[in-house]
Each structure stands twice: as structure tokens, then as C-alpha cells.
Amino acid sequence: MAKKIMGYIKLQIEAGKATPAPPVGPALGQRGVNIMEFTKAFNEKTKDKMGFKVPVVITVFTDKSFTFVVKQPPASALLMHAAGLKGGSSNPLKNKVAKLTQAQLMEIVNRKIEDLNTDDKEAAAKTIAGSARSIGIEIVD
């Protein structure tokens, strides 16, 4: 028999650095989840994504057990990392702060496509390119 779901918790946590401190502790504590068990499992699963804040969806069951799914970092974070930036442009229409090649864009698309609402790489590339434009990164051939 399947477990009954109590609810979902969506958080963005620094990969490999989850601690019982806010926002993790209070969010899990409200549902009665074992916080230390989650932080150890999360840190172990995300140690290969260090340096990124990763979205995680935690499914909490009525018996206080849980499962979680770690998603890819946000597209903007991947784009800024590839361009070597700390932040985007304050005026992205006029001030371009970096350039990425089509190959770099496709590398990000291949990593991010599982979280996007499309299976078509061309459509995913347009989505990621739009995110790049909105933070002042120009895509060149």
C-alpha cells in the first residue's frame, strides 16, 4: 500500500551545505521531519553541485518519513557561472555584461532540459537564451 502524502516543501538550498538553521530547520520542523536525517542525505546527494543553490522538492508522508528530489540549479545561476559573473546587468537591454557561445548555451541546455517543460532542445535553447538576455548576457555564434 502506498504511503499517504502529508505535503510538499519546496526550498532552494546551497548544495552540500544544508544545516538545521533557517530556512531548512523551521520548514521541516513544522511537518515533523527528522531534520538531521534530511541534511545528511541532502549534503551527500548534492556534493557534486557545490557552489550552486539547488531547488529541492521534499515530499512528506503522514508517518513523518520523506523523500526528496534535487533539481538542477536555476538557469540564471548556470549562465552566470559559465560567463564568470557574480551578478547580471542592471540594464540588460543596453549594457551587455558578457558573451557566451552557442556551444556553451547548448551545454547548459543539456544540463537543464530535464527540469524544463519541453523535450525539444531547440525550444529549450530559446528559453535559456531568453534568460541570458534578461541578465545581460549576449549569445554569439
Swiss-Prot record:
PTM entry text: One or more lysine residues are methylated.
Q: Name one GO molecular function term.
A: large ribosomal subunit rRNA binding
Family matches, as Gene3D superfamilies: Ribosomal protein L11, C-terminal domain (1.10.10.250), Ribosomal protein L11/L12, N-terminal domain (3.30.1550.10)
Keywords from the UniProt entry: Methylation, Ribonucleoprotein, Ribosomal protein, RNA-binding, rRNA-binding
Task: List, alphabetically, the SUPFAM superfamilies matched.
Answer: Ribosomal L11/L12e N-terminal domain, Ribosomal protein L11, C-terminal domain
A family per Pfam = Ribosomal_L11_N
Any one annotated GO CC term: cytosolic large ribosomal subunit
- GO BP term (any one): translation
Quote the InterPro entries the UniProt record gives: Ribosomal_uL11, Ribosomal_uL11_bac-typ, Ribosomal_uL11_C, Ribosomal_uL11_C_sf, Ribosomal_uL11_CS, Ribosomal_uL11_N, Ribosomal_uL11_N_sf
Q: Which HAMAP family match?
A: Ribosomal_uL11
Main function? Forms part of the ribosomal stalk which helps the ribosome interact with GTP-bound translation factors.
User: How does this polypeptide assemble, per the annotation?
Assistant: Part of the ribosomal stalk of the 50S ribosomal subunit. Interacts with L10 and the large rRNA to form the base of the stalk. L10 forms an elongated spine to which L12 dimers bind in a sequential fashion forming a multimeric L10(L12)X complex.
Concerning its family, UniProt says:
Belongs to the universal ribosomal protein uL11 family.
Q: What is this protein called?
A: Large ribosomal subunit protein uL11
- The encoding gene is rplK
